[in-house]
């Protein structure tokens, strides 16, 4: 599906949970880092056209997960290409969403 065809109906909370579950699965594999990098780079982080059309609750779930759980995984530092920006953004999101 092209990103320009994305719609609110395509990305729901169950779809997000599948992405996050897949990210956790890949993180646990010894050979999963390249696929996790692709998932992060092309779906979870660098493609705002996907997430801008989703309901606010789905966006909140994604950013809460990113600021609370995802940033603590062992392979995160070697997986994400724009680590400085992501960590900085997650720190801001943590303050905004979680109050600390």
Curated annotation (Swiss-Prot):
Annotated TM spans: none
Tissue/organ expression: Expressed in prostate and testis.
Organism: Homo sapiens (Human)
Pfam families noted in UniProt: DUF4704
The entry's keywords: Chromosomal rearrangement
Disease with which this protein is associated in UniProt: A chromosomal aberration involving BCL8 has been observed in diffuse large cell lymphoma (DLCL). Translocation t(14;15)(q32;q11-q13). The BCL8/IgH translocation leaves the coding region of BCL8 intact, but may have pathogenic effects due to alterations in the expression level of BCL8.
Identification of the protein by name: Putative protein BCL8
S-S bonds: none
Source species, domain of life: Eukaryota
